[in-house]
């Protein structure tokens, strides 16, 4: 699941959408919420990066390599004619997150060569089999 940051003073509808996503997740994994119905499980909820991450109290903890789909993403961004001022902003951001991806996947020690990446903030703890 993906949604907006928890807090966004410029787009309050974004915060509301995240609250709805969190409620849907809660219901999907709640034993006894709807007796007789299958429990769907508890997927992670990732919050994608807002325009002003430092104002939204958003901190990335997950990076996704989007190099293979960057051209399509850039073309999609350019479809929003009213936000032309953000086209280069998002290109620069994807390149910066690509650097974060490379550094956190091993960097000079054999890290994966992502040119473009996106950052996400996970809401819930993740489970692992080993550290």
Model-derived segments and spans:
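Metal-dependent de-N-acetylase/amidase catalytic core
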Residues: 1-131
């Amino acid at each position: 699941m993906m949604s907006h940051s928890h807090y966004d003073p410029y787009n309050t509808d974004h915060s509301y959408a995240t609250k709805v996503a969190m409620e849907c997740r809660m219901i999907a994994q709640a034993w006894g919420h709807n007796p007789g119905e299958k429990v769907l499980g508890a997927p992670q909820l990732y919050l994608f990066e807002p325009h002003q991450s430092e104002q939204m109290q958003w901190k990335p903890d997950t990076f996704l390599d989007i190099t293979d789909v960057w051209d399509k993403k850039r073309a999609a961004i350019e479809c929003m004619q009213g936000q032309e001022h953000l086209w280069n902003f998002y290109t620069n951001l994807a390149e910066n997150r690509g650097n974060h991806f490379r550094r956190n996947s091993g960097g000079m020690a054999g890290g994966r060569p992502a040119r473009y990446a996106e950052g996400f903030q996970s809401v819930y703890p993740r489970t692992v089999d080993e550290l």
